[in-house]
Amino acid sequence: MQSVLKKNIAIIGGGWAGMAAAVVATQAGHHATVFEASHALGGRARVVSGSHASTLPDGTPLTLDNGQHILIGAYSETLKLMQTVGVNLENALLRMPLTLQFPDKTGLRLPDWPAPWVVGLDAAWGILTAKSWTWTDKLALFRAASGWQRGGFSCSQHLSVMQLCERSKPKITPRVMAELIEPLCLSALNTPMADASAQVFLRVLQDAMFSPNTEVHIQIDEKTSRNTTFGSANLLIPTRDLSNLFPHPAAAWLVKHGGNVLLGERVESIAFSNAGWQVNATAVKQTFDTVILAGSPSNMAIAGIHIAYAAINNIAKELEHLLRREVQDWQNSVNALRYEPIATVYAYSKGAKLSQPMLALRSDSGSEAQNPAQFVFDRGQLGGEHGLLAFVVSASQGDRFALQEKVIVQGRSQLNLPDLQPIQTIIEKRATFACTPGLQRPANQIAPGLLVCGDYVAGPYPATLEGAVRSALQAVKLL
């Protein structure tokens, strides 16, 4: 077996991608040091603390996240890594069937089968039994899905989701578009279906509804463990805050295995020399063999380009032209990214309990939308305070307070909660990249020894936790 040349690696950014890269690099025999400018791990999927913390009307303090994330059973790499760092998946995640049901119980709900013995059987049953769908709706969807499956869930890179559905024969009906395709597209790609990549959408659909089950190992105590299975289409909703779902356990695991996690250490400059990469942070100056940039694309683009061009000046002249072209290509791909916001409106209604932990809502889109939220989560059923709800507005538009007011009116009407009141509205302005047709996403490598990971990096998934983790795995493979 070939031995691994141990490298000293700096990882800039302590979000999900950065922490995943640190864990996987350590598993591969390297030494990892994570630099995080803030005092909180998790990036765009973390707990909100400090001056941004909130309370209920009676003064009860709340633990809120900066967004409402979900996983699915097909997110095999994320689930595997969570187990590696000691997270008990059954305690940390609420498993439920893929559900896009509305408060009136119409819409799609797959059966509550932990792991269907025939791939896609639960999806077929869910479509057959969908309330309010006519046989015309169901047959059109069956035929479209059958065609996508025969085509290997592949299509032209330049098709939008709307074009894909309109070209299906027969065309997918308006009801199925409104109650399945659009909400699924927004929740997975955070991009309206008229602008969303059909190829990426098909990949998500394939993995969620037509992929093998995920086997997971549950450690009950020091002496007892058992295996269980998640169906690929199972929704896995966090029942603890997002920082404690993976980033904090990953940090503890990393330190235990000899790595470093440096909070409050803003990297001010990185320079390349024959000795390696000199990382200059707030209170730390250290040389590394490799640097992995794991922050947001906008921040990493600025830093990465400056670092790469500076490094090229210290590389042999015969390589200079080639490297400059590679760096320019990487910069162009980052510049081509557009970003979409996600708003989370936390609201409270004393005694409120939804019919299930997550419901779809009747919504419209655009700056004039009167019903902007697509989903609502009952935090009381997810380990939080009873009566606390989280409304999610993907690809949100407009002023924070105007958006909040519209969501509260929408919630009062659609959930029949006349006393619903706002608690806090959090908008991540650059929550995801716009997953558009033909988009060429940045590569994992800017220059030799200068790598990148994050959910925006080239890969099969949209901007999801699984996309972030898989980009980290790919970056570590390049070490």
Regions found by a protein language model. Name each.
Residues 47, 54-93:
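Conserved FAD-binding subdomain of flavin-dependent enzymes
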Residues 26-52:
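Glycine-rich FAD pyrophosphate-binding loop
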Residues 78-211:
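Mobile amphipathic helical/loop "lid" adjacent to a hydrophobic cofactor/ligand pocket
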Residues 207-277:
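Helical element adjacent to the flavin cofactor pocket in flavoenzyme catalytic cores
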